[in-house]
Amino acid sequence: AMKYNLTPMGTHPHEWFMYHGAHYGYRSANALALANWVDVYDGHLGIALTDTYTTDNFFSSFDTQYAKLFDGLRWDSGDPYVFTEKALKHYREKRIDPRTKTVVYSDALDLEGVENIRSFVNGRLHDVYGIGTFLSNDVGVKPLNMVIKMFECKPQGGKEFWPVVKLS
């Protein structure tokens, strides 16, 4: 996007939060990762990933400022119906109309899964869907389910690698 002067689009990678946890400590990882994301991307790429250190932990850091600032959330693991209710509750508690926020559902979705979630959401928020594996591999063979995650990093160019963790 920078090279071609395009508006960047996308969401946080888990590794962003994982790095912040290793560097700054896991108790403050979500809050610092959100703050630094805002500093780096200046309001672009406004869909927040919620599950690096569990969704409940994420929501404890996703205060009113971030809930208003970010365009929405990305569901990437767990039960989409439970997540939807948590997101709706969180926005309402912050006095934000959930219909003004986007949730990107993106965990191993197929067309039937999208229809089921869409029916459940029923216009209570703006729902969009990331169908990767099953859209590009809808030919009747079982897709590979492969996730690659960071397992260590060198904070600020240090000499030693530090372990990182992801909890969903």
Feature roles, as predicted:
Residues 55, 78-101, 106-168:
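Gly/Ser/Thr/Ala-enriched C-terminal appendages of enzymes
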Residues 2-86, 90-91, 116, 121, ...:
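Buried, small/hydrophobic-residue-enriched core segments of structured protein domains
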